[in-house]
Amino acid sequence: MKQKVLFVLLNGYADWGAFLSTALHVAVIPDGEIKYEVHTVAPTLDTVRPIGGFRTLPDYSFENMPKDYAALVLIGGNRWESPEAELVAPLVKEALDKDKIVRAICNGASFLCSHGFLNHVKHTGNGIDQLKKWGVQFILT
């Protein structure tokens, strides 16, 4: 059975940051088994516009997204400091509480940092100066 991986899309998402979906959606080895289903989720079912301008129609809204997913991926972009992004924090908390995989790219990782989700885990993301702009308090180890 394929596992669902949900990619969170906000308007202004970095479409190149969705590269991970390609690796998950096809078999890594030619003629190999495809283990994942890639789906998109957004605040509503309305069209989402990334930085590159293509229109993306999400599979699910935050209200009707499935509960039986394996991973939640926050794609970077320029709207992670918006009120729209704040709707994602409860989704991340619920995913982590249920021991689901949560991953983020670029400003998605900064969003996780700014909400304290990465306080106790090693992670990569934007540089220290960028994180300070987000108001992130951290300890370097």
Regions inferred by a protein language model and the residue ranges of each:
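Active-site-adjacent pocket-lining segments in enzyme domains
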Residues: 2-14, 18-20, 24-44, 54, ...
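A cross-family phosphate/adenosyl-ligand binding-site feature
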Residues: 51
